[in-house]
């Protein structure tokens, strides 16, 4: 059967109606039989190790445990595809359908959804315009609620009554001379469902809009909050009573597996225990209702069913946490979804991707700001397709298999090809958590020995990285478009300013600041070569390199360009006239020789070899 391609624009998460939940789990077999309801708490038969019928692993509901094999073994081949066994009712198909086929449990009494009851904010409490404490009192069978005050003068709609108050009113209703009628009182999730059903959302929305226009302050904020919830219900075409469950879905069995261990014992998902509690209590409640058990016993069983469903959806949200063996809290549906180890963050957002790697970062002070050091071992793995392509294209290798063998043997040719491949091919480095766009930047890779990624110290503030064991991920942009985009938009040398403040984020720090200070510092104790004259800057640096002048020694260097010098007086400290008519003016940091008519012949600047080195470095960088 050809797979149909389904295109969609977005995924919408909304409340599911009881009919929708039944549709998820209910299927009509080719023989007309409707299956889907899980009615037994059993999982597998411990003697035959086969799933129990109508249980949590039922093959009739969820599909066969083995490919193309029914429960009783009558059909065992792919040629029987699609047949439903007459004896056991199992459809002959692939076992992987057990990863997506759902079931459902029909509840003997309605149950409030704990997310909407105990969530922050409580949507049920907001919609009913009642305090959360009162709603909880109703749901957990501590208080009655008036659903219809009838002709009783003292009763009000949604008023809470305790046991004694209700008994008193009941006595009045059934008294011989009583004229009370139309009084309706409820308790538990059934009463809550009735209250939610009575809500007319459109009318409430109109009424709230009028009240908001007339009110202010705290009251107005509360009304707006309620209106927002009501408008969302209207917008998604959901009904408030759907927050009370009559049917609960059973997730596919392969998502809550049961596996046999070496010693013959079984390891099972916590969900199976939570589902088993729900089914046991549900079946017991149905039986009690059948035999018309006393109201107090039925009510207690309904409360226990509510608590069992609460634990299944979100264990520990309300009441005592349900624990398994060795007092470990059981993992509910919410626990599987939420948090760092949950389905979204761990498996969907945090999944491993191809052409990516991860390693510890170390400082690479010899790198340029747009470069990173990539370990050879990692690079050959990441760029393997490009290397194989280049080998086949240029080096008379005939096929991929041959090229892979060369790579496995670490042939010297491979490293030359890898060097060619990575030249001009940027890689992207990412450090979690990526809190702003500079958390992922592009670099040109340089092959390095070892197993650590080398990073330029100036890009650390953008990544909020340091070298105390931080790890970073590498990603390779594959297409030409992706490479061009990485180079133009994401290269580290183009991300100098912070997107948040507009201030420079690449600023010298630590060793760099210390080095600049040390080069330009004054040290009166540095006397070696002090006072010497040099014809140009290069001569002074050469003298320092030969060791004849200290780094901080004051020397005079001929420099005929413009010199800016703060704190220097316009008046010379001394003026000396020579026999040839020239005049030498000495300032604090300059010595200028001029002709009689003021024409400059030469200028010497008082500086240190360190300052010359600093000036040359900055000047070279600015020119390039």
UniProtKB/Swiss-Prot annotation:
The molecular function terms of the Gene Ontology recorded here are:
DNA binding; DNA-directed RNA polymerase activity; magnesium ion binding; zinc ion binding
- The enzyme's first-digit EC class, named in words, is transferase
Which residue spans traverse the membrane? none
EC no.? 2.7.7.6
| Reaction catalysis annotation | RNA(n) + a ribonucleoside 5'-triphosphate = RNA(n+1) + diphosphate
- Give the GO cellular component terms, alphabetically: DNA-directed RNA polymerase complex
InterPro entries from the xrefs?
DNA-dir_RpoC1_gamma (IPR012755), DNA-dir_RpoC_beta_prime (IPR045867), RNA_pol_asu (IPR000722), RNA_pol_N (IPR006592), RNA_pol_Rpb1_1 (IPR007080), RNA_pol_Rpb1_3 (IPR007066), RNA_pol_Rpb1_3_sf (IPR042102), RNA_pol_Rpb1_clamp_domain (IPR044893)
> Can you tell me which residues bind Mg(2+)?
466, 468, 470
Its cofactor is: Mg(2+); Zn(2+)
- One Pfam entry for this protein is RNA_pol_Rpb1_1
Q: How is the cofactor bound?
A: Binds 1 Mg(2+) ion per subunit. Binds 1 Zn(2+) ion per subunit.
Q: Would you kindly state one Gene Ontology biological process term found in this protein's UniProt entry? A: DNA-templated transcription
Tagged with keyword Transferase:
yes
Q: Does the keyword Zinc apply?
A: yes
Q: Which UniProt keywords apply?
A: DNA-directed RNA polymerase, Magnesium, Metal-binding, Nucleotidyltransferase, Transcription, Transferase, Zinc
Residues annotated as binding Zn(2+) are 70, 72, 85, 88
Family in the record: Belongs to the RNA polymerase beta' chain family. RpoC1 subfamily.
Q: What does this gene product do?
A: DNA-dependent RNA polymerase catalyzes the transcription of DNA into RNA using the four ribonucleoside triphosphates as substrates.
* Subunit and interaction comment: In cyanobacteria the RNAP catalytic core is composed of 2 alpha, 1 beta, 1 beta', 1 gamma and 1 omega subunit. When a sigma factor is associated with the core the holoenzyme is formed, which can initiate transcription.
What protein does this entry describe?
DNA-directed RNA polymerase subunit gamma
Organism field: Synechococcus elongatus (strain ATCC 33912 / PCC 7942 / FACHB-805) (Anacystis nidulans R2)
């Amino acid at each position: 059967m050809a797979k149909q391609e389904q295109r969609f624009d977005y995924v919408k998460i909304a409340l599911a109606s009881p009919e929708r939940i039944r549709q998820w789990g209910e299927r009509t077999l080719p023989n007309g039989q409707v299956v889907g309801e899980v009615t037994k708490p059993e999982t597998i038969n411990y003697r035959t190790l086969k799933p129990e019928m109508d249980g949590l692993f039922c093959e009739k509901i969820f599909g066969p445990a083995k490919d193309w094999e029914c429960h009783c073994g009558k059909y065992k081949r792919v040629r029987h595809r699609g047949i439903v066994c007459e004896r056991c009712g199992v459809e002959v198909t692939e076992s992987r359908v057990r990863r997506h086929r759902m079931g459902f449990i029909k509840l003997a009494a309605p149950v409030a959804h704990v997310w909407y009851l105990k969530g922050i904010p409580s949507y049920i409490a907001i919609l009913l315009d009642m305090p959360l404490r009162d709603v909880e009192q109703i749901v957990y069978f501590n208080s009655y609620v008036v659903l219809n005050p009838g002709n009783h003068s003292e009763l009000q709609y949604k008023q809470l009554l305790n046991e004694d108050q209700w008994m008193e009113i009941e006595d009045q209703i059934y008294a011989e001379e009583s004229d009370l009628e139309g009084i309706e009182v409820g308790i538990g999730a059934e009463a809550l469902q009735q209250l939610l059903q009575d809500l007319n959302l459109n009318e409430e929305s109109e009424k709230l809009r009028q009240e908001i226009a007339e009110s202010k302050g705290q009251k107005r904020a509360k009304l707006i909050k309620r209106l927002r919830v009501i408008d969302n219900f209207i917008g998604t075409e959901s009904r408030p009573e759907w927050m009370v469950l009559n049917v609960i879905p059973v997730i596919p069995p392969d998502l809550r597996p049961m596996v046999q261990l070496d010693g013959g014992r079984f390891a099972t998902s916590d969900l199976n225990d939570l589902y088993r509690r729900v089914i046991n209590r549900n079946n017991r409640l149905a039986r009690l209702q059948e035999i018309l058990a006393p109201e107090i016993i039925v009510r207690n069983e309904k409360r226990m069913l509510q608590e069992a469903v609460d634990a299944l959806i979100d264990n520990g949200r309300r009441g005592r946490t349900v624990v398994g063996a060795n007092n470990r809290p059981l993992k509910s549906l919410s626990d599987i979804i939420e948090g760092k180890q949950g389905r979204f963050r761990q498996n969907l957002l945090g999944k491993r991707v191809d052409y990516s790697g991860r390693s510890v970062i170390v400082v690479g002070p010899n790198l340029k700001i747009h470069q990173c050091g990539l370990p050879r071992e990692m690079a050959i793995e990441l760029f393997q397709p490009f290397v194989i392509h280049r080998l086949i294209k240029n080096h008379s290798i005939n096929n991929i298999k041959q090229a892979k063998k060369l790579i496995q043997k670490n042939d010297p040719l491979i490293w030359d090809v890898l060097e060619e491949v990575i030249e001009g091919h940027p890689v992207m480095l990412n450090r979690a958590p990526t809190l702003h766009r500079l958390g992922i930047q592009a670099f040109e890779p340089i092959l390095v020995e070892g197993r650590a990624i080398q990073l330029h110290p100036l890009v650390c503030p953008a990544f909020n990285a340091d070298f105390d064991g931080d790890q970073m991920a590498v990603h390779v942009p594959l297409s030409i478009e992706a490479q061009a985009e990485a180079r133009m938009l994401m290269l580290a040398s183009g991300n100098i300013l912070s997107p948040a403040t507009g201030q420079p984020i690449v600023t010298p720090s630590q060793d760099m600041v210390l080095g600049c200070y040390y080069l330009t510092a004054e040290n009166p104790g540095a006397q070696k070569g002090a006072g010497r004259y040099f014809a140009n800057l290069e001569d002074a640096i050469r003298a320092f390199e030969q060791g004849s002048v200290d780094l901080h020694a004051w020397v005079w260097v001929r420099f005929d360009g413009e010199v800016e010098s703060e704190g220097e007086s316009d008046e010379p400290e001394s003026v000396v006239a020579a026999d040839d008519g020239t005049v030498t003016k000495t300032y604090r940091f300059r010595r200028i020789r001029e002709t009689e008519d003021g024409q400059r012949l030469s200028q010497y600047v008082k500086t240190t070899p360190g300052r010359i080195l600093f000036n040359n470095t900055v000047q070279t960088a600015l020119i390039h």
